[in-house]
Regions:
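Short substrate-entry loop that stabilizes the transition state in hydrolases
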Residues: 70-72, 78-114, 183, 257
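N-terminal cap/lid segment of alpha/beta-hydrolase-fold proteins
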Residues: 30-68
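C-terminal catalytic histidine-bearing segment of alpha/beta-hydrolase fold enzymes
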Residues: 276-340
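Serine-hydrolase catalytic core
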Residues: 217-298
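Glycine-rich nucleophile elbow surrounding the catalytic serine of serine-hydrolase chemistry
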Residues: 150-160
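Alpha/beta-hydrolase active-site loop
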Residues: 119-139
Length: 340
């Protein structure tokens, strides 16, 4: 009986891990046509509306605004995996108390939004561009103080939009434990015989260790694990070279998806540091440094409290909320990147 419960727990964990993961070529020819509209806020400062994306499909957005006319700083959330909305905890309420507007959205093919699910490819990246265009035109918004917070796989969407649309008026990107590219990360994990990667592909293969032929046929987020063209459209470690704003990585010692591995973190932040020309930092480590696998013990990583476990539910944890709140306040109000 104990063995059955243990196996059930392991496969539930694998299913949650799959949700996290499921958590550059030339720009498509698109013409932004976002129109401003009168926004009706509830007594609690919340508004629900839809705006056209760059391809004309409507995308649903949620806005929470402090009382008053502003202007206020704005934080746009980008969900990971197949999530519909990024903010799934008390963080927006805590940000509201600090005088910060939050904007949340469902990408095309998700929730109330029109279109087909693009799994954080160019179409979803265009959704974020449309939202930034819309938000930056609102009267209660500080035009030079719009930030992005991405969760997990949302880093792929956020970095893609920032790289492909460098003129977006974004003050900073905060990335909580995003993968460099799910396909590439899994390939690397398999090559290094990392437990999380082996368990994930077995789960995707109905609980069995896949043969070479089966492995080549496994799909994740609509694409083969080995489809280079597919993952090139969803590769934060490539997009990071061209991001057009300061970049802050938030990383716990135990990653919510990739265990103790930090290869994905290193791939993104080192690329941004060496190629983008932007201010970069991971946690409270010194800014603009190059990270090494051999020196991981020398860097500062966050830790969960004793009653918290790394995983999909980490997005709801008080530890993550509190740490993200502190970094959001720092980036909006202290603006450490301006002292570079």
């Amino acid at each position: 009986m104990v063995k059955v419960i243990h196996n059930l727990s392991r496969y539930v964990s694998l299913f949650l891990l799959l949700l996290i993961f499921t958590a550059c070529t030339s720009n498509p020819k698109v013409t932004p046509t976002v129109e401003q509209q009168e926004i009706q806020f509830s007594s609690g400062g919340t508004a629900f509306l839809s705006i056209p994306s760059l391809n004309g499909n409507k995308i649903a957005i949620h806005i929470k605004k402090p009382a008053g006319d502003g202007p206020f700083p704005v934080l746009i959330g980008v969900a990971g995996g197949d999530g519909m909305y990024a903010f799934q905890s008390a963080l927006p309420i805590r940000l509201l108390e600090k005088g910060i507007v939050t904007v949340d959205f469902a990408s095309q093919g998700r929730g109330e939004s029109e279109g087909d699910d693009n799994h954080h490819g160019f179409v979803h990246q265009d959704d974020l561009k449309a939202i930034v265009d819309f938000v930056s035109g609102l009267s209660f918004v500080q035009k030079d103080n719009i930030g992005i917070l991405s969760y997990s796989y949302g880093a792929v969407l956020a970095t893609g939009a920032l790289a492909r649309y460098p003129d977006m008026p974004i003050a900073f990107l905060i990335d909580w434990e995003g993968p460099s590219s799910p396909g590439k990360d899994i390939q690397r994990g398999l090559e290094n015989d990392e437990a999380w990667a082996n368990e994930l592909v077995q789960f995707l293969n109905n609980g069995r260790e896949p043969t070479s032929e089966e492995l080549s046929q496994i799909l994740l987020h609509g694409g083969s694990l080995f489809d280079e063209a597919y993952w090139a459209e969803r590769d934060a470690s490539r997009f990071a070279a061209d991001i057009s704003c300061p970049y802050l990585r938030v990383q716990f010692d135990q990653d919510h998806a990739q265990g103790l591995s930090k290869s994905h973190m290193i791939a993104i932040i080192n690329t941004a540091t060496m190629s983008s020309g932007q201010w970069t930092r991971c946690n409270d480590n010194p800014p603009n440094i190059i990270y090494s696998e051999e020196e991981l013990s020398h860097y500062h990583f966050h830790h969960y409290s004793d009653n918290e476990i790394a995983g999909l539910s980490s997005i709801y944890s008080q530890s993550v909320d509190t740490i993200l709140l502190g970094y959001v306040e720092e980036m909006f109000f202290s603006r450490p990147y301006e002292s570079q």
